[in-house]
């Protein structure tokens, strides 16, 4: 067909006009003289209706019946050019309908495996390249896109410069036991866990920087919140205090939620997400509680009937049940601040007057989604950082460039990182992180 194509998402601008859409057949139904065809083109879903008498009237009996029969026999995922008149229809869940006047098959589809019936998780993951075409999976990807768009918009508006950190490195930013190792021309190299160390160099040059890209963690974990490859946004900034950093993180998360509400409302509707809850997370201030106060709260409530977490002492790290309880207790995203230095990273700056605690924060999302952001102030004193590395038995020669940052005009600075897939899962309201990335990499899955 030579007619100009429009996207389904824009059909509201063409009411009463004849348009042509390039799409795939998501489903079809009907009987006798009428056929319903559900169409998708990546931007949205839309229903077309074909009436046999209209085809006979327009094309004559023989050609009209032939064209109508083609529509009746369409298979799921057949690609088509479909032409028709856009009409408003309050009865339709899409709000509009296409009165089909012509249809041309582009590519046939036979025995499409991911049918509308229920399928097991392994089957769907084996066919992830096809499962992505389903209505809910498309909605999740649209939410992911809105979050990425809002990320770039937020940091641009707040004076940050995009600063690309390397994926290959010779040292670890976090836990050296969770590294993927590869050969780099005869030398060991590792896939990046985080761009943070390099971003600190960027912050000393440019003031405020962020990066966004894939990171890798060789975690042998099979939980619903872990991937071995995921996309991380890391931000670093000079001259901000700890409280100012928390303010920035809160503003960022609220901007992401607002971005999804603005750019992907239909996706939230498809997923039946509680939009009022998302709006409340924007309007209400996030809670801030110290690690020690959070431990005390957990101890005070551990005998409650609705709790199912293990007892913790001061100095213990939280598990997922503890994070869930804390965020649900406050009902909004909650910062837990000033964790013990004993289980946090070497580069975190101690709390003034309390060296056993560090100036850090984890942001816990409500509704059981747990940690979505981790951040801290960085140790900016050369001697203090060297002493900490010696205490941990670290090889300082592997971090010479990082130590240099403290030797030449060091300043107070900090940063934070967010796993985009965890944020997508939270905003979309889905149950498992594997649906928040196009092709998830997990402990026992590396294809498709």
From Swiss-Prot:
Principal place of residence: cytoplasm
Keywords associated with the record: Aminoacyl-tRNA synthetase, ATP-binding, Cytoplasm, Ligase, Nucleotide-binding, Protein biosynthesis
Subcellular location: Cytoplasm
EC number: 6.1.1.22
Gene Ontology MF annotations: asparagine-tRNA ligase activity; ATP binding; catalytic activity, acting on a protein; nucleic acid binding; transferase activity
Entry keyword Hydrolase: no
InterPro entries on file: Aa-tRNA-synt_II (IPR004364), aa-tRNA-synth_II (IPR006195), aa-tRNA-synth_II/BPL/LPL (IPR045864), Asn-tRNA-ligase (IPR004522), Asp/Asn-tRNA-synth_IIb (IPR002312), NA-bd_OB-fold (IPR012340), NA-bd_OB_tRNA (IPR004365)
Example GO BP: asparaginyl-tRNA aminoacylation
Superkingdom of the source species: Bacteria
Reactions catalysed: tRNA(Asn) + L-asparagine + ATP = L-asparaginyl-tRNA(Asn) + AMP + diphosphate + H(+)
PANTHER family: ASPARAGINE--TRNA LIGASE, MITOCHONDRIAL-RELATED, ASPARTYL/LYSYL-TRNA SYNTHETASE
Subunit structure: Homodimer.
Entry similarity comment: Belongs to the class-II aminoacyl-tRNA synthetase family.
Cited HAMAP family: Asn_tRNA_synth (MF_00534)
Record protein name field: Asparagine--tRNA ligase
Organism of provenance: Streptococcus pyogenes serotype M6 (strain ATCC BAA-946 / MGAS10394)
The encoding gene: asnS
